[in-house]
């Protein structure tokens, strides 16, 4: 950011990952945890977290998002995609690049035509994310004789709703057959019998009074 300026310019390093939803659908791929969509994606940053907890800054963010959304859905994005596609496709689908293109020509057209719809979906996710609990961190499990205790941070909600938690322990990451499963926990801690030596996975999900859910950062 420039010196002697009251405005900060924050540029994400992963802009190359933007507008990938349609491509991921075509490849049956998902790179995102539940919390990585909407404002919860920034909750792990202390500065952003404090800003999001302040109504003044949330309103300022909403104004900026709404302004950007209006620009991206006024027809210009379709025009840009059409213009760039006409310029780039002849080169992309000719040698040697053609050997490394992850999409067919028809799939390329589908992705290009889906950009505005992705913007609309992302805007809806942004709005909805305020209705969900924010993600949280799970502490390091502690073994005590024949039991193990696990604690985690409280899940924040913007409406100060009551939150309950479910806890699962499994020996495989899909949690298809959990060894331990507890639901309706009202405090962010639980205990269970010490399992046999091995590799285990923990999952904690927060649920607010309205039924909205959120996973921990660590899940």
Task: Explain the meaning of each model-derived region.
Residues 4-157, 162:
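Middle-to-C-terminal accessory/interaction subdomains
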């Amino acid at each position: 950011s420039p010196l002697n300026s009251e405005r900060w310019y924050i540029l994400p390093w992963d802009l190359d990952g933007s507008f990938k939803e349609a491509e991921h659908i075509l490849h049956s791929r998902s790179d995102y945890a539940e919390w990585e969509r909407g404002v919860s994606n920034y909750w792990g940053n202390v500065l952003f977290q404090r800003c999001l907890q302040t109504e003044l800054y949330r309103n300022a963010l909403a104004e900026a998002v709404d302004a950007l959304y209006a620009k991206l859905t006024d027809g210009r994005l379709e025009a840009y995609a059409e213009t760039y596609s006409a310029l780039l496709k002849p080169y992309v689908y000719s040698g040697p690049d053609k050997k490394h293109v992850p999409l067919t020509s028809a799939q390329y057209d589908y992705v290009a035509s889906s950009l505005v719809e992705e913007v609309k979906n992302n805007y809806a996710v942004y709005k909805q994310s305020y209705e969900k609990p924010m993600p949280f961190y799970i502490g390091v499990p502690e073994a005590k004789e024949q039991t193990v205790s696990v604690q985690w941070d409280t899940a924040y909600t913007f409406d100060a709703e009551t939150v309950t938690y479910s806890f699962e322990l499994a020996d495989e990451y899909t949690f298809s057959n959990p060894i331990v499963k507890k639901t309706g926990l009202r405090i962010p801690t639980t205990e269970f019998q010490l399992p046999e030596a091995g590799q285990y996975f923990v999952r904690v999900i927060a649920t607010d009074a309205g039924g909205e859910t959120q996973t921990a950062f660590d899940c």
